[in-house]
Structure formats: structure tokens, C-alpha cells
From Swiss-Prot:
Subunit structure as annotated in this protein's UniProt entry: Homodimer.
Enzyme class per UniProt: ligase
Stated name of the protein: Coenzyme F420:L-glutamate ligase
Family statement: Belongs to the CofE family.
Residues annotated as binding GTP: 9-12, 38-39, 43, 116, 205-212
Lineage, top ranks: Archaea, Methanobacteriati, Methanobacteriota, Stenosarchaea group, Halobacteria
Keywords: GTP-binding, Ligase, Magnesium, Manganese, Metal-binding, Nucleotide-binding, Potassium
Source superkingdom: Archaea
Name of the gene this protein is made from: cofE
Catalytic activity: oxidized coenzyme F420-0 + GTP + L-glutamate = oxidized coenzyme F420-1 + GDP + phosphate + H(+); oxidized coenzyme F420-1 + GTP + L-glutamate = oxidized coenzyme F420-2 + GDP + phosphate + H(+)
Length: 251
């Protein structure tokens, strides 16, 4: 398996044909997986906004005041309003905002970015990342696309790449019913391949001002396995989410 960044991409702006810009810069093959950072997808789709686009509601004022009290520094209620509008649920309101997006992703601040946004204050996640992945797939020679983001993980320090949208491949590879090396039947293992591809690509893409937003994964095969598009855990079976709903931050 080989991973390499797509070179020479300029700053992406609203309305840019991202698929064409990728396709003209690299000789893609049909079986390649193209991992595209959500930041450039959002920029091309016009998801850049100013804080003034989000007048603060009473709830946003209260949320920002609480966060400011905990952090010991002022928090902009307009940012809290943007998070509220981009979320279906605020799972935690302190000591930070843990949210569920409309498309099922759970993360901090609804994934809203304030870094590397030259045309505004805020960069929101794509509205429907899998549809974004499908549109990119239609415009490139490769037949598999993953839209990635970075986020933290419970029980571990640091961030890693995750998939928030995909097209042309299943989200997971199902090993259940197959045999291990000792001949025992596997009954549990479902491998989330799109998250693993996103995480591997993030090692190549990097972060900050030296980051490259599009990475090609070559010579990776899904194999002869059953696949599934189950990616975001259903609320009913998400016991951590249910527990966090009942948890209260004690400062």
C-alpha cells in the first residue's frame, strides 16, 4: 500500500471545482482511495461564515457565560450560537461543547474550525459529507472517496483523522463468520476501514500551515468480505452518549 499527497493545490475558494483540481494534478487510478480533508470541501461548498452571521440567542449567551467562567477568559456567544445551529444535540455543555451534527458525527464544537479561514471567521463542516464525497467521486478517475476530519477520542490524548463522509466503498469490513489462524470462527470483529484510511492519510497530510488537504491511498484492497455502511452509532446503543447526557461537570 502506498500513500502520497496531491501536490500544488491552491487555497480553495467558494465555488471551486475541487474534483477537477484534484484530477488534473495527479494521475489517479480506478482503485485509488482519495481522502479529502473536510476543510477544503467546506471551502468549495461555501461553508465559510462570519461571527456576525450568528446573532446570539439567550441560550448561546448562557452557554458562553458558563464556558467563560470555567476557562477564566471571555467566550464569544456568537460562536456558541453557531455551534447550537449546527447541532442536533448538545450532549455536554461544560467544560466544552460536545455535540451531535445533523449527519451523525459527534465531536467538539460541531466541528467548526477557526484556523486557516482567510475569507471569514468560521469554517463549518460540509452539510452532507457523503453527498460531497459522491460529487467528488463523479469528477475524478478514482472510484473511492473519503471525506476526513480530525477530532479527539475518549480515554486518549491527542487527535486523529476520522471519516465523516464516504462514497464508492463500504464504511466497514465485516470479519464475522470468517476463521482466525487457529480455525476459530470470529463473531465480533467489524473493522471500520474508512476511519483507518482517514487516519493513515492524516499522517501524510499533516496539520497547520504545512498541511496538504488531499491524499491518495493506492493498492489498498477491501478484499472478499461483507461490507456495511454502519458508521455512526445509533443513539439507542450508544451507552457512552447516554451516560454523558446524565453527567454534570463539577468545577
Amino acid at each position: 500500500m502506498e500513500l502520497f499527497a496531491v501536490p500544488g493545490l491552491p487555497e480553495i475558494r467558494d465555488g471551486d471545482d475541487l474534483a477537477a483540481m484534484i484530477d488534473e494534478r495527479v494521475d489517479l487510478r480506478e482503485g485509488d482511495v482519495v481522502v479529502v480533508a473536510s476543510t477544503v470541501v467546506s471551502k468549495a461548498e461555501g461553508r465559510t461564515f462570519d461571527l456576525s452571521d450568528f446573532p446570539a440567542s439567550e441560550r448561546a449567551e448562557a452557554v458562553a457565560d458558563r464556558l467563560a467562567e470555567i476557562a477564566g477568559e471571555e467566550k464569544d456567544p456568537r460562536f456558541a450560537q453557531a455551534v447550537i445551529e449546527e447541532s442536533t444535540e448538545l450532549i455536554m455543555e461544560a467544560p466544552f461543547l460536545l455535540t451531535a451534527t445533523r449527519f451523525g458525527h459527534i465531536g467538539v464544537n460541531a466541528g467548526i474550525d477557526q484556523s486557516n479561514v482567510p475569507d471569514g471567521d468560521l469554517l463549518l463542516l460540509p452539510e452532507r459529507p457523503s453527498e460531497s464525497a459522491a460529487r467528488i467521486r463523479e469528477g475524478i478517475a478514482a472510484d473511492r472517496v473519503v471525506v476526513s476530519d480530525t477530532c479527539g477520542r475518549p480515554f486518549r490524548h491527542g487527535q486523529r483523522g476520522v471519516a465523516i463522509g464516504w462514497a464508492g466503498l463500504p464504511a466497514s469490513r465485516d470479519w464475522r463468520g470468517e476463521r482466525d489462524r487457529d480455525g476459530r470462527e470470529m463473531g465480533v470483529t467489524v473493522q471500520n476501514v474508512i476511519d483507518e484510511l482517514a487516519s493513515a492519510a492524516n499522517l501524510v497530510a499533516g496539520e497547520g500551515d504545512g498541511g496538504t488537504p488531499v491524499v491518495v491511498v493506492r493498492d489498498w484492497e477491501f478484499g472478499d468480505h461483507d461490507g456495511s455502511d454502519n458508521h455512526f452509532r445509533e443513539v439507542e446503543g450508544d451507552f457512552v452518549r447516554q451516560a454523558l447526557r446524565q453527567w454534570t461537570f463539577d468545577d
